[in-house]
């Protein structure tokens, strides 16, 4: 079976012969007996200058061809044993007149037996390789469909020659080469060809029977495998003897598998030996998979150019010999297609003797992302395809697959390789011109004239085209001339003649060297291989140096000779040592305008190398030599070499060395070459180094300059002895300790790599985009969170630091994303690098400051309260951005090219400036951050072991958590930046670990964004709460998101009775887009039903709404951040503390009376007072129509009159009770009384609750007025106060509804009259008077007292005028919309009213007056003002002593209650109008007479005029200051008391000047039954230095220890109605009045509650009230629902 595997046919190859005949002579062709002439090609003309040119004429054309030469010659010689043809124009014509022509014929002598069965078309010569038609003649490769299918393993090689010889015709194709016909017969015998060099090439063929497997018809070779070792088995090439017999088993159509190798440069031989390669035929599919011989016989490894192509076990695989380089033209020669691994050899172009060769190699194609699928298919089709051995597939396209279809089946790995001509130009090293050969012969003659030879050489090199061999000959002649002149100069006795002869010789030599360096001769240099180029360049430099020193040695006195030609400036200087005063500089500025290069030799170095008192120096400057003396791996032209080295892998016999070289950077010679010598051919070491200034030829896309010199021994550039002193974008300064030829080498940034992203693969690029996008999104969310939810945070230094860190990180991410897309030539590249440098320095500095801030917090009083430290933050800003900008500016001044000469637009160039201005500052900041973090951790450990207060422990835990998060943040950011840096550096050096760094950067950068969002946003409880509030308040969000049941984590007080909310309290959902102050109320009844009791917990949760009241202060008052806790309590004096529970943050419960362990400076603190709940009405059923609205349903027994609810008439079990709530903000007490604190001016008095900050120096207060919404089931919102004026009526009579209709009309008229807020405010005071009057009547009835007479009627006029002036400029920025007041009810007709109480800090409620910043002494420097203000101070002082500690520490102790009872018994000082009246005058008087009332009215009138004048002068003054607001609030409090007293006098009630109105601090103690009055609740907050509002540095000089006045609310009293909203416009009021339903129930203005048969003593309901002030000056109030 072995004989069936392959059949080898061996026969003698026909000889290939060439015959020539000069013009005018006969061409005779003869063959041996039995052989006939078989012409291959012929031409009458001239292709070579050496043939038939005895006189060396070089003017003849070498591209002379007669197209019909072969036809004419065939007519005379074809199929003849011999013939003779005259080479004359009469026979062939004259294709090129004036040129001496010759006739050239290529033929074979074949046997007569073969000619009877074959055609007359012969095969082309070996170097023509025209085996098939060029399908894609693109010059780089082509498909040659010669063989489809092949043996497994080695595969059958295509025949070098066609199987049948034929006549090559030139008709119609314009050339000498035709396509051979289909091969249908056996291969021809061997033939020999006579090459120009006289060598013969043996050609032989053999055929092999092949079978095509059914499963594969493409016959493509297997993918090649690159190996760097050669221990694989290769098929042997064995010589065989020619034989004319063809075995019977052979197939006539089977192709030959013998590979014919040419002798030059390939793997063949030159001795005519037949080389054959054995291979196995393909097996059938059945045997290919199962035969045991597949692994042995069917395995072969081919080695081409040291590339091992392993095709073991792959059926139907051919080897790489089916790949060909396409035909092309180069150096006036046509290079036909050549098989990979072969060398195409042909004679040199006309006018030159020798041979030219060019090799076809297989190169690896670098992946190009710009190729799409179609381009790759076409590229694969046009470059790599196997030869077909099937005659049917060769010329019958119907039986073969199309080429594109075959390309689809090409293995992907093989498609990465393509056949390429190597090197880029043909090798013409052996081509020499005839005239230079003549000069070489002349210079070697003994009596030749050296001057004449030098002149001829300069003329020839300037006018003639040279080839690679000519360069070698020319430089050799230059050296020979100098050597001969050295001996011949002695024959000239005259010194002047000697110098003249040598100078003329030097001029010719310099001119010749300039001609060789000229641009027109660049192709001649490229004809040489790299080694020969370097050798020729070295020979040229040494030849010039030898000739120059020949002249220098001849000169015996001081002289300077300059030889200047186009490309060379040569200066020979002979200097006397005594005349050398300074350094010698070359060249002069006017001598060499081509370049600004400069070389400076120090004087000491010259004197050391003097001889005989003379110093001989040779300077030379070259132009265009830099394009010749290129560094290794860059011996081609610059533009081509970039693409060549980057995009191909040269697979040659020295591929091992080349593989390592390709990993190196591409370097160019980036300066002109300049030379200085002190001795001929010697590298003289100098005691002092020379200085060179070299100008950069290329300033863009170059980096890393290196000073080098040309080493004559190694023929290469070397940096030994030279160093770079300084460099910039255009010049470099070098220092060398020896002399020779110098230049600058620089790295080239590949222009084909347009940006950094071109270095990424597809996945890497996508992942980087995603990672940066994620990080940017989360950073933006963090910044928006800090800005939108600004009030959640204390305006602290830490918050400012993190905002700046986020801004820097955002800038870094965006600049990096923009920079990796930019090219190095982009104008934005330098700017991006500069700003990125600044952003990184700023970011690292902020990290350092964050660590330092944590350290300073732990080592100072800031541990207790984190506040905004503006001076410190300003220092951080200055150090961070100022220092970063300064460093970048210094870097730009020192070396601007640092930002533009790097490979990528996101890195600086790695030089000294980079390490000094980037690496060093970043390391310093990072080390400082680590150091401060370590110190902070030590301090925390020490503090945790010491005894601290609860608040300090809380704050310490917060700081500990911040430091941990910051340290993790620091580590993560360091990992991101380090990964990015190493990835960029690795990508530049093409390291294998680059991908690891890239994916590390992607992962760490994504984690950085997630970490910012989670640990800096989500983990913050306050931000989570703000997120929920933000979702609920925006109507554009889905309702399912806005109306979700929510329980906040703020502090809530659960009373001792039932839950906070009633049953079925429901959920809360905001219906207004603006921030509103509202509190939905539920019910709070005693539950006897077990099911209702189980619902209390859920109702309580629903009643606690985190965003129920979030109105903000006006802009003028927005900076009043009060570090306050939340004080809650009942409306009764505290008597018991049992059963009270506080709902802490995090939904944890604890007992009251203790500080919250998790509270901090910005959290809530709960302090409350409590009285056991008295008799409660039965629990009723609660309904709600809208999410933020609670209605209720009356229990069985029918609807009661509304008058009962207003006046507390009827049974106490069914009447909801309301008391007066007074909210005041004041300072925290100082724990160390009498001790002066930092930031204060003196001792700080006590205040209601403990201080949160030891540096609180002054008080601040904000007045809160409650607004009420009264609704009734089944109707729209009612007016807010008119019902209190109506008498009670039976609810079941018809007259009741008639009276309601009349009252509705009265209300409309009354409401129209209230056209301004001034009238409305007056009505507030009027209603307050009714409540107080009713209380006094009840008290006096119980005590048997009589009513006092009413004041005169004229007092009302004064009151009305003053009130209108006082409230003229009141404004509001937090109006409640109509939708809030006009909500209906679903309670039905049997329901009762529901009061929803909303506590707000609306500016309209706070009554801000726009008056000037006046002095208190100036304002009250009269009898009226002084008395009022002094009386106010007395009231404040009394209030301060009364409340100073009553609600401290979160509980009310028995000691505080005793102090409070003691303060209740103190007399109240009365008001007087005189200026010199003391504050404590008449303190024993408890009532006033009518005369005193009248006198007080006159005082009020005068005071009104005084304040009116102040108001008129207030406009145009600066904004309100803290001191101004304090005075205004004091005036406001006094004004309200005066207004209340006017209402008393207007209605004839006795005026008690020492009694405050209901709702004020002193009104609580003024009644006869103080236990029935509501307890006073104070929401107190300490103001630290640096808070948002800012602490008052000092109190007023007149009252340094007096507490600020208590600002009363418009109290509704135990029997009063709800008050109208103070910020509603008249238009809104009218709209509400039009929507009134006829079911409203009111009563007359006369108070008749004492006559009601169902009236009961006033019942005081226990209602828990909690208010929380966050950092945004937003008060969140939670009021226990009213009882039903």
Curated annotation (Swiss-Prot):
Stretches the record annotates as Disordered: 181-300, 370-391, 1080-1100, 1228-1255, 1270-1353, 1441-1520, 1587-1669
All copies of domain SUEL-type lectin, residue ranges: 21-110
Domain GAIN-B span(s) in chain numbering: 559-752
PTM description: Proteolytically cleaved into 2 subunits, an extracellular subunit and a seven-transmembrane subunit.
Cytoplasmic topology ranges: 787-799, 848-873, 940-966, 1016-1684
Glycosylation: residue positions: 138, 251, 297, 336, 396, 653, 701, 728
Modified residues (Phosphoserine): 1156, 1247, 1254, 1315-1316
Regions of compositional bias (Low complexity) in chain numbering: 381-391, 1298-1314, 1328-1348, 1631-1654
Compartments where located: Cell membrane
GO cellular component, one term: plasma membrane
GO BP terms, alphabetized: cell surface receptor signaling pathway
SUBUNIT field: Forms a heterodimer, consisting of a large extracellular region non-covalently linked to a seven-transmembrane moiety.
Name this polypeptide is given: Latrophilin Cirl
């Amino acid at each position: 079976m072995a004989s069936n595997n392959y059949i080898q046919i061996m026969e003698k190859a026909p000889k290939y012969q060439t015959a020539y005949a000069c013009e005018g002579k006969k061409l005779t062709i003869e063959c041996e007996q039995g052989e006939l002439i078989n012409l291959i090609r012929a031409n009458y003309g001239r292709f070579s200058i050496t043939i038939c040119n005895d006189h060396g004429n070089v003017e003849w054309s070498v591209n002379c061809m007669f197209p019909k030469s072969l036809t004419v010659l065939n007519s005379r010689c074809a199929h003849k044993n011999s013939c003779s043809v005259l080479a004359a124009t009469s026979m062939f014509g004259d294709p090129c007149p004036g040129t001496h022509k010759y006739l050239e014929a290529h033929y074979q002598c074949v046997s007569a037996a073969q000619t009877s069965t074959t055609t007359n078309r012969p095969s082309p010569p070996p170097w023509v390789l025209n085996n098939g038609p060029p399908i894609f003649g693109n010059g780089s490769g082509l498909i040659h469909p010669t063989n489809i299918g092949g043996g497994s393993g080695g595969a059958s090689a295509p025949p070098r020659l066609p199987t049948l010889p034929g006549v090559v015709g030139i008709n119609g194709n314009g050339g000498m080469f035709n396509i051979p016909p289909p091969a249908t017969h056996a291969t021809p015998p061997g033939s020999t060809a006579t090459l120009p060099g006289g060598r013969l090439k043996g050609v032989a063929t053999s055929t092999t029977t092949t079978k095509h497997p059914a499963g594969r018809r493409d016959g493509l070779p297997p993918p090649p495998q690159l190996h760097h070792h050669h221990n694989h088995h290769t098929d042997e090439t064995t010589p065989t003897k020619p034989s004319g017999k063809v075995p019977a088993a052979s197939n006539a159509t089977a192709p030959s598998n013998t590979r014919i190798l040419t002798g030059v440069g390939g793997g063949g031989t030159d001795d005519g030996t037949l080389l054959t390669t054995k291979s196995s035929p393909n097996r059938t599919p059945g045997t290919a998979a199962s035969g045991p011989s597949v692994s042995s016989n069917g395995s072969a490894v081919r080695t081409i150019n040291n590339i091992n192509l392993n095709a073991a076990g792959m059926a139907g695989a051919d080897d790489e010999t089916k790949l060909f380089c396409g035909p092309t033209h180069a150096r006036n020669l046509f290079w036909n297609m050549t098989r990979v691994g072969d060398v195409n050899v042909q004679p040199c172009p006309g006018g030159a003797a020798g041979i030219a060769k060019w090799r076809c190699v297989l190169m690896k194609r670098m992946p190009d992302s710009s190729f799409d699928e179609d381009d790759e298919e076409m590229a694969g089709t046009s470059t790599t395809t196997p030869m077909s051995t099937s005659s049917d597939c060769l010329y019958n396209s119907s039986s073969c697959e199309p080429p594109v279809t075959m390309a689809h089946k090409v293995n992907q790995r093989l498609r990465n390789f393509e056949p390429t001509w190597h090197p880029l130009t043909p090798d013409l090293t052996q081509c020499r011109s005839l005239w230079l050969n003549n000069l070489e012969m002349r210079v070697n003659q003994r009596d030749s004239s050296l001057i004449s030879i030098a002149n001829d050489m300069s003329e020839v090199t300037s006018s003639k085209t040279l080839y690679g061999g000519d360069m070698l000959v020319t430089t050799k002649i230059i050296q020979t001339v100098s050597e001969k002149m050295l001996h011949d100069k002695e024959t000239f006795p005259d010194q002047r003649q000697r110098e003249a002869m040598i100078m003329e010789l030097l001029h010719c030599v310099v001119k010749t060297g300039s001609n060789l360096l000229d641009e027109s001769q660049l192709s001649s240099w490229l004809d040489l291989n790299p080694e020969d180029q370097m050798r020729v360049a070295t020979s040229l430099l040494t030849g010039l140096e030898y000739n120059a020193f020949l002249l220098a040695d001849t000169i015996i006195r001081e002289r300077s000779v300059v030889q200047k030609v186009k490309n060379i400036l040569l200066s020979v200087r002979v200097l006397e040592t005594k005349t050398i005063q300074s350094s010698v500089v070359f060249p002069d500025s006017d001598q060499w305008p081509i370049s600004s290069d400069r070389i400076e030799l120090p004087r000491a170095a010259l004197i050391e190398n003097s001889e005989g008192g003379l110093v001989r120096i040779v300077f030379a400057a070259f132009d265009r030599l830099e394009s010749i003396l290129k560094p290794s791996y860059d011996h081609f032209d610059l533009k081509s070499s970039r693409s060549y080295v980057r995009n191909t892998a040269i697979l040659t016999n020295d591929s091992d060395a080349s593989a390592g070289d390709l990993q190196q950077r591409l370097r160019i010679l980036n300066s002109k070459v300049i030379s200085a010598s002190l001795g001929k051919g010697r590298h003289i070491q100098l005691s002092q180094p020379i200085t060179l200034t070299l100008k950069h030829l290329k300033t863009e896309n170059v980096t890393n300059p290196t000073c080098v010199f040309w080493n004559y021994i190694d023929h290469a550039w070397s940096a030994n002895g030279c160093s770079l002193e300084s460099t910039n974008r255009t010049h470099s300064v070098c220092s060398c300790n020896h002399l020779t030829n110098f230049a600058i080498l620089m790295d080239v940034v590949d222009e084909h790599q347009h940006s950094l992203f071109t270095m990424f693969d597809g996945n890497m690029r996508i992942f980087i985009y995603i990672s940066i996008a994620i990080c940017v999104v989360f950073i933006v969310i963090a910044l928006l969170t800090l800005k939108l939810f600004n009030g959640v945070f204390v305006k602290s230094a830490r918050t400012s630091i993190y905002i700046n860190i986020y801004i820097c990180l955002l800038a870094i991410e965006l600049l990096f994303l923009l920079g990796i897309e930019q090219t190095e030539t982009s104008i934005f590249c330098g700017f991006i690098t500069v700003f990125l440098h600044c952003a990184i320095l700023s970011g690292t500095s902020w990290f350092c400051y964050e660590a330092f801030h944590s350290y300073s917090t732990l080592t100072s009083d800031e541990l207790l309260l984190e506040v905004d430290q503006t001076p410190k933050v300003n220092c951080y800003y200055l150090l961070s951005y100022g220092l970063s900008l300064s460093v970048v500016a210094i870097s730009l001044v020192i070396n601007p090219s640092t930002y533009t000469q790097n490979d990528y637009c996101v890195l600086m160039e790695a030089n000294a400036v980079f390490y000094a201005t980037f690496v060093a500052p970043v390391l310093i900041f990072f080390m400082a951050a680590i150091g401060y973090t370590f110190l902070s951790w030590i301090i925390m450990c020490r503090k945790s072991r010491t005894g601290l207060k609860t608040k300090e422990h809380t704050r310490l835990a917060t700081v500990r958590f911040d430091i941990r998060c910051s340290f993790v943040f620091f580590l993560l950011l360091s990992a991101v930046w380090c990964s990015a840096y190493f990835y960029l550096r690795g990508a530049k050096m093409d390291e294998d670990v680059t991908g690891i760094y890239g994916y590390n950067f992607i992962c760490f950068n994504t984690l950085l964004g997630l970490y910012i969002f989670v640990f800096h946003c989500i983990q913050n409880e306050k931000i989570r709460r703000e997120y929920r509030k933000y979702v609920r308040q925006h109507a554009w969000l889905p309702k399912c998101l806005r109306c979700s049941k929510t329980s906040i984590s703020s502090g809530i007080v659960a009373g001792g009775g039932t839950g906070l909310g009633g049953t079925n309290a429901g959920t809360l959902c905001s219906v207004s887009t603006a921030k509103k102050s509202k509190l939905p109320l539920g019910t709070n009844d005693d539950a006897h039903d077990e099911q209702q009791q189980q619902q209390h917990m859920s109702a309580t949760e629903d009643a606690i709404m985190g965003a129920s009241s979030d109105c903000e202060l006006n802009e003028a008052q927005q900076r009043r951040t009060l570090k306050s806790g939340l004080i809650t309590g009942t409306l009764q004096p505290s008597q018991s503390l049992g059963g009270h529970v506080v709902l802490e943050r995090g939904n944890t419960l604890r007992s009251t009376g203790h500080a919250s362990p998790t509270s901090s400076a910005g959290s809530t603190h709960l302090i409350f007072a409590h009285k056991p709940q008295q008799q409660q009405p039965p629990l009723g059923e609660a309904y709600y129509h809208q999410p933020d609205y609670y209605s209720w349903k009356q229990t069985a027994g029918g609807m009661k009159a509304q008058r009962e609810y207003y006046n507390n008439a009827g049974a106490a079990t069914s009447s909801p009770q309301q008391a007066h709530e007074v909210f005041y903000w004041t300072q925290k007490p100082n724990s160390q009384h009498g001790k002066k604190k930092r930031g204060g001016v003196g001792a700080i008095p006590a205040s209601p609750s403990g201080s949160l900050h030891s540096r609180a120096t002054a008080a601040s207060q904000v007045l809160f007025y409650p607004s009420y919404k009264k609704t009734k089931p089944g109707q729209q919102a009612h007016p807010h106060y008119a019902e209190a004026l109506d008498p009670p009526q039976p609810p079941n009579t018809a007259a009741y509804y008639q009276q309601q209709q009349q009252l509705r009309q009265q209300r409309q008229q009354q409401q129209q009259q209230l056209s301004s807020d001034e009238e409305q405010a007056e009505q507030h005071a009027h209603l307050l008077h009714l409540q107080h009057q009713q209380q006094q009547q009840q008290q006096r009835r119980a005590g048997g007292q009589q009513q006092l007479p009413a004041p005169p009627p004229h007092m009302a006029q004064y009151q009305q005028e003053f009130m209108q002036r006082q409230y003229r400029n009141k404004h509001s920025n937090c109006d409640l919309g109509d939708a809030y007041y006009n909500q209906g009810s679903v309670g039905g007709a049997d329901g009762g009213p529901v009061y929803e109480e909303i506590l707000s800090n609306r500016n309209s409620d706070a009554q801000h007056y726009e008056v000037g910043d006046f002095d208190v002494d100036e304002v009250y420097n009269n009898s009226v003002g002084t008395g009022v203000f002094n009386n106010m101070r007395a009231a404040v002082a009394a209030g301060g002593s009364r409340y100073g500690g009553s609600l401290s520490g979160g509980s009310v102790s028995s000691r505080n209650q005793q102090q409070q009872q003691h303060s209740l018994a103190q007399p109240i000082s009365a008001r007087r109008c005189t200026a010199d009246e003391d504050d404590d005058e008449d303190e024993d008087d408890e009532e006033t007479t009518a005369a005193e009332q009248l006198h007080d009215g006159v005082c009020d009138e005068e005071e009104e005029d005084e304040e009116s004048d102040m108001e008129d002068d207030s406009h145009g003054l600066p904004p309100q200051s803290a001191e101004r607001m304090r005075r205004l609030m004091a005036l406001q409090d006094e004004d309200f008391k005066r207004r209340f007293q006017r209402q008393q006098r207007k209605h004839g009630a006795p005026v008690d000047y020492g009694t405050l109105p209901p709702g004020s601090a002193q009104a609580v103690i003024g009644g006869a039954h103080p236990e029935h009055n509501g307890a006073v609740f104070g929401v107190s907050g300490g103001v630290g230095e640096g808070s948002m509002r800012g602490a008052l540095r000092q109190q007023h000089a007149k009252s340094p220890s007096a507490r600020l006045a208590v600002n009363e609310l418009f109290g509704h009293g135990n029997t009063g109605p709800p008050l109208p909203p103070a910020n509603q416009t008249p238009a809104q009021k009218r709209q509400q009045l039009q929507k009134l339903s006829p079911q409203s129930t009111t009563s007359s203005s006369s108070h008749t509650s004492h006559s009601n048969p169902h009236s009961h003593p006033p019942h005081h309901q226990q209602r828990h009230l909690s208010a929380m002030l966050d950092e945004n000056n937003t008060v969140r109030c939670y009021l226990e629902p009213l009882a039903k």
